[in-house]
């Protein structure tokens, strides 16, 4: 293998390219991406609105700063129009509109995901915004700057983060959610009580059970959103915070895809075409709790799949990849994290039991920590955890993620060693107490 082409220079593509350059210095690596700012972190809009950065260009991955390795990469700024797998060539269009045929030997597809809705009519109107790419984020910041009334479609982690950032700017924010709870993919309904209270306290209007089907422009220039049940909402700008979807259209009729448009790969991330691999947001890794493919378009997944493939191509064997679906965020004065399955979703696969403990002061101002553990009833194996707190607990959710990965039970997790330092390790002790409580609860069933 003398040459490798990688489509997409964002997290998975860049991680793969740099690791390949390190492991196989003789390899010619061509990175192709139409975006000049492919290293942009989608959370840049929030960071700028919250005053963490001055310029959006500061929101880039800074982990890869080995100039010697970076200089080995051949970066091509061009749009891939077509993958012709039978001839093993790519059809490229350069910024000057020049078309070129580029032959490949081994192709790694790392085109990521898209945030645009395929189901909402009018989602392509000028005032309907997304924040996935650098250009989209630039446009969003510019178009909401002088506007006061913003509607966000989607109350997942993206929508809630945006709602918080906009509230800090004094904007009037309406959050529309299709389900009956916020962050339904990551948290059970009762765990969102403190977060929803904080949101409503600063004036965020949350409207649930509203599925937007159409967006149109009014005579005054505002945007009107119509739900599938006929409800109407009006605002000056609309931010789409819908779920990301794999950007796999170039691979249609080229390799096998699932119904959700994720690309089917084997344990080595190779597609149904022996010359084509897929990584990052294009694929669904097995969720360790259910051993079934689960789509999680997260930066950590992108980086690890890219690096994993590089090791495989360098001839270094590793155990097959799995995931635990771990996420974390901070908004409305609360740290929020989850890993694994929610109790509602997990109950579709297993007979589960859960235990939750809450630390909360009477005035709801100082101490607040809610921790919920979920396990299989038959053996206590941990399948999920959710934490809400005012203190930063994000390292703790990584510990639970590892516990899920190595299939610890509630009792095994309870009797793991942990640091006990008064005033510094209350969250670690809370995890111990909840794991112990879950174990005792199962004994009584």
Question: Can you describe what each PLM-predicted range is?
Answer:
Residues 1-10, 148-156:
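Beta1/beta-strand and adjacent pyrophosphate-binding region of the FAD-binding site
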Residues 2-72, 165-186:
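Beta1-alpha1 glycine-rich phosphate/pyrophosphate-binding loop at the start
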Residues 9, 285-391, 442-445:
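Mid-to-C-terminal Rossmann-like scaffold of FAD/NAD(P)H-dependent oxidoreductases
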Residues 76-88, 208-221:
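A conserved short coil-to-beta-strand element within the FAD-binding core of flavoproteins
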Residues 97-106, 228-237, 272:
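Core beta-strand elements of the Rossmann-like FAD/NAD(P) dinucleotide-binding domain
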Residues 126-147, 232-308:
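FAD-site-proximal beta/loop scaffold in flavoenzymes
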Residues 159-214, 300-301, 318-342:
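Rossmann-like dinucleotide-binding cores of NAD(P)H-dependent redox enzymes
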Residues 407-445:
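Cysteine/selenocysteine-centered motifs that mediate thiol-based redox chemistry or coordinate metal-sulfur cofactors
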């Amino acid at each position: 293998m003398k040459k490798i082409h990688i489509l997409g220079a964002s997290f998975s593509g860049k991680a793969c390219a740099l690791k390949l350059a390190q492991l196989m210095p003789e390899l010619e690596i061509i990175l192709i991406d139409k975006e000049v700012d492919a290293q942009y972190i989608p959370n840049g809009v929030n960071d700028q609105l919250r005053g963490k950065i001055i310029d959006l260009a500061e929101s880039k991955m800074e982990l890869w700063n080995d100039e010697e390795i970076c200089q080995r990469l051949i970066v091509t700024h061009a749009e891939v129009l077509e993958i012709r797998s039978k001839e093993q060539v790519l059809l490229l269009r350069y910024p000057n509109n020049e078309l070129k045929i580029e032959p490949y030997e081994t192709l790694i597809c790392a085109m990521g995901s898209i945030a645009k809705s395929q189901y909402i009519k009018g989602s392509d109107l000028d005032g309907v915004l997304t924040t996935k790419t650098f250009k989209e984020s630039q446009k969003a910041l510019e178009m909401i700057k002088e506007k006061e009334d913003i509607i966000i479609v989607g109350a997942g982690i993206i929508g809630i983060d945006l709602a918080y950032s906009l509230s800090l700017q004094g904007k009037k924010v309406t959050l529309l959610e299709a389900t009956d709870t916020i962050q339904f993919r990551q948290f059970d309904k009762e765990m969102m009580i403190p977060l929803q209270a904080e949101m409503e306290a600063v004036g965020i209007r949350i409207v649930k059970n509203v599925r937007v089907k159409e967006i149109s422009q009014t005579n005054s220039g505002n945007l009107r959103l119509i739900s599938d049940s006929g409800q109407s909402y009006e605002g000056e700008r609309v931010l789409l915070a819908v779920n990301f979807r794999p950007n796999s259209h170039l691979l249609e009729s080229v390799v096998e895809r699932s119904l959700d448009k994720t690309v089917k790969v084997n344990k080595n991330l190779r597609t149904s075409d022996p010359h084509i691999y897929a990584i990052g947001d294009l694929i669904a890794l097995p969720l360790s709790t259910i051993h079934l493919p689960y789509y999680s378009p997260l930066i950590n997944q992108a980086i690890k799949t890219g690096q994993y493939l590089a090791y495989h191509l360098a001839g270094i064997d590793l155990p097959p990849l799995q995931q635990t679906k771990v996420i974390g965020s901070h908004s409305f004065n609360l740290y929020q994290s989850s890993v694994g399955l929610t109790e509602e979703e997990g109950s579709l696969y297993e007979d589960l039991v859960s235990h939750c403990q809450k630390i909360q002061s009477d005035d709801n101002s100082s101490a607040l920590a809610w921790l919920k553990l979920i396990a299989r009833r038959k053996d206590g194996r941990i399948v999920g955890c959710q934490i809400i707190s005012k203190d930063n607990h994000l390292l703790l959710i990584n510990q639970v993620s590892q516990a899920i990965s190595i299939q610890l039970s509630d009792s095994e997790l309870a009797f793991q060693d942990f640091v006990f330092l008064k005033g510094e390790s209350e969250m670690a002790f809370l995890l111990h107490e909840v794991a112990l409580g879950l174990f005792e609860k199962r004994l009584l069933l």
